Swiss-Prot record:
One of the primary rRNA binding proteins, it binds directly to 16S rRNA where it nucleates assembly of the head domain of the 30S subunit. Is located at the subunit interface close to the decoding center, probably blocks exit of the E-site tRNA. The gene is rpsG. This is Small ribosomal subunit protein uS7. GO terms for cellular component: small ribosomal subunit. It comes from the Bacteria.
Length: 156
C-alpha cells in the first residue's frame, strides 16, 4: 500500500457511438498494441452481428452478458505457517467489471467463428443467456471459493 495520498481513478470517456462508458472500457479491453480503431471496429461489428442475429438491442445484450459473468467471490493465495491457502474473498465492484470483460474477451478469442466480431457477438449472446465459456469460468471461480470456504477466517 502506498503511504502517500490515494491517486484518483481516471474517468473513461464514453464511446462516440453509444455514449456509454462501459462500452468504451470494453473497447479498451479488446484493444491490442494500442490499435483502438481496430478494437472499435471489432466491438461495433459484434454489436451489428447481435442486432442482425438476435434482433435485440446490443447495449442490453452487452449489459446482461457483463452482469451475468461478474464474479461475486474469488480465491487469493495466503501463506500461513509454511502452507499456502486459497482464501475466498469478495471481489470489489471495479474488479468485478474488469474480470467479466477480460473473461468475455478470452472466451471470444477461443471460439471457432471466422472474425473476432462474430466470435465476440456469439460469446456476448451466450453470456447474456447464462451459457458460454465466460460463464463457465465464473462458475469455476465460484466453485473454487466454495471449496475453500473453510479458510475464509484467514481473510486479508
Amino acid at each position: 500500500m502506498p503511504r502517500r495520498r490515494e491517486v484518483p481513478k481516471r474517468e473513461v470517456l464514453p464511446d462516440p457511438k453509444f455514449a456509454s462508458q462501459d462500452v468504451s472500457k470494453f473497447i479498451n479491453v479488446i484493444m491490442q498494441s494500442g490499435k483502438k480503431s481496430v478494437a472499435e471496429r471489432i466491438v461495433y461489428g459484434a454489436f451489428d452481428h447481435i442486432t442482425a442475429k438476435a434482433s435485440k438491442d446490443p447495449l442490453e445484450v452487452f449489459a446482461a452478458a457483463v452482469a451475468n459473468v461478474k464474479p461475486v467471490v474469488e480465491v487469493k493465495s495466503r501463506r500461513v505457517g509454511g502452507a499456502n491457502y486459497q482464501v475466498p474473498v469478495e471481489v470489489r465492484p471495479s474488479r468485478r467489471m474488469a474480470l467479466s470483460m477480460r473473461w468475455l474477451r478470452e472466451a471470444a478469442r477461443k471460439r471457432a467463428e471466422k472474425s473476432m466480431a462474430q466470435r465476440l457477438a456469439g460469446e456476448l449472446l451466450e453470456a447474456a443467456e447464462g451459457r458460454g465459456a465466460a460463464m463457465k469460468k465464473r462458475e469455476e471461480v465460484h466453485r473454487m471459493a466454495e471449496a475453500n470456504k473453510a479458510f475464509s477466517h484467514y481473510r486479508f
